[in-house]
Amino acid sequence: YFSMPKLVPSGSLLGMDTNRIKEWSNVVTAFTEGKVNGKTIGDQGTAPKKVLYLKGPNSTEFSKEPTRYATLIPTVYNADTLGIRPDLIKRPINTWAELLNPEFKGKACILNIPSIGIMDAAMVVEALGEYTYPDKGNMTKEEIDLTMKIFTEAKKSGQFRAFWRDFNESVNLMASGEVVRQSMWAPAITAVRSQGIPCVY
């Protein structure tokens, strides 16, 4: 979805006629309406509902209301979370701020995919009470600089064991116990659990 604001205005994308997509009515409402179980969810950044519909089949403009012309069919989606090893931490963890807690120095890890990792880092910054972003998905240069300053200082102090680059690496770091909490995708937590190792979010 993050590429849609560049692709659509360029005229490089034709709208898909949702009337021709048999299962369109079954697309999760988080994408089509920005709601889950009837409750509106956050729309910071390039929220799918902002870039899902076009005004017409050849439009270079998004529609704020649902139309029959869509930019994408959502196929894979995920949730970033803070994964923890409760057997090694031995106390509740309920805030992203714990990622930078010196109590676990050298046992933390964060995603090393900048477009996603910066969002996880911003959630930590907010949880620490350092700053509240008006829109984490559309940061100013100053907001990026602040976020990176906080994480660069944490890195220099030895807070992080690693910066994971792919799904398997995040699973292996957590399963081995090399890290006890990290930014993590929900399916990776399931993969750790499937090895009989406690892992929660």
What are these regions (language model features)?
Residues 158-201:
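Extracytoplasmic/periplasmic substrate-binding proteins
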Residues 2-169:
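Extracytoplasmic ligand-binding site segments that recognize negatively charged/polar headgroups
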